[in-house]
């Protein structure tokens, strides 16, 4: 596909808004869920959002493959030849959604040559889109009307954001032992990348299990706001390069 154009972007914003409405309408059924093979929950909202997004994307860009959390069975023997594909989490933060927290989102990235060239994250609860086009600054769109350019705000005294369910992770605890002058805050889902891009927080260390669809759009958005996401060897995250669809431990930095 050629670089993302305004027509496709507009349709993606409308599509994620529609999926978000479905998710919000199913909040009362959030406790009705099953457990997948990887021990993560799956709700009716996950499935409904997945079905809508995939069906619309197949019509919008029929020549681009799609990898969604709910279709992750696609073998690497097929995926490894992809130079470009959509990487989707139709409902990121499912545990937060089940627990009644607003920290859930829809995450869509376009991967080109193992790296995200476009990222879009939508918060259905707040009706806020965060997105970045290739080689462009990251933007925040509130209620489909008000735009704001996102810029990180690095500080020596840091506000560190961590996953709501990861505070007991041994790697995270050990990592924070070596930092000074900081305060921690808990949030769920890929919205943490967006909150750093907005300048609300300054640092997000992740040491627990994390899949590639959990990070791709957020990485793209944070980089477009002036931040970076690197693994523990100071390398940028690479996508669809191994059989496993797992992101390594990383640090998201303003």
Where is each model-derived feature located?
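Short helix-loop capping/hinge motifs at secondary-structure junctions, enriched
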Residues: 137-147
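N-terminal subdomain of lithium-sensitive/metallo-dependent phosphomonoesterases centered on the IMPase/IPPase/PAP
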Residues: 1-91, 174-177, 235
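Short loop->beta-strand "edge-of-pocket" segments that line small-molecule binding or catalytic clefts
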Residues: 149-172, 179-187
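Oxyanion/phosphate-interacting regions
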Residues: 1-16, 20-21, 174-178, 192-254
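Generic detector of well-ordered alpha-helical packing
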Residues: 47, 70, 90-93, 97, ...
């Amino acid at each position: 596909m050629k670089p993302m154009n305004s027509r496709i972007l507009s349709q993606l914003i409308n599509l994620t808004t529609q999926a978000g409405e479905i998710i919000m309408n199913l909040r009362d059924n959030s406790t009705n869920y099953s457990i997948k093979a990887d021990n993560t929950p799956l709700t009716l909202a996950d499935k409904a959002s997945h079905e809508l997004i995939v069906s619309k994307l197949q019509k919008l860009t029929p020549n681009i493959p799609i990898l969604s959390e709910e279709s992750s069975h696609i073998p690497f023997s097929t995926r490894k030849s992809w130079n470009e594909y959509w990487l989707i989490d139709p409902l990121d933060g499912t545990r937060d959604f089940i627990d009644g927290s607003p920290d859930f989102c829809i995450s869509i990235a376009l991967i080109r040559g193992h790296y995200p060239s476009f990222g879009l994250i939508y918060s259905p609860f707040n009706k806020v889109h965060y997105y970045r086009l290739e080689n462009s600054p990251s933007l925040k769109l509130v209620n489909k009307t008000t735009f704001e350019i996102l810029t990180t705000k690095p500080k020596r005294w840091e506000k560190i954001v961590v996953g709501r369910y990861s505070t007991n992770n041994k790697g995270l605890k050990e990592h924070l032992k070596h930092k000074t002058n900081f305060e921690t805050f808990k949030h769920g889902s890929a919205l943490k990348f967006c909150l750093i891009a907005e300048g609300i927080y300054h640092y997000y260390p992740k040491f627990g299990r994390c899949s590639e669809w959990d990070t791709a759009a957020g990485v793209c958005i944070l980089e477009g706001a002036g931040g970076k996401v690197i693994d523990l060897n100071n390398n940028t995250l690479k996508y669809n390069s191994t059989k496993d669809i797992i992101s390594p431990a990383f640090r998201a930095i303003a």
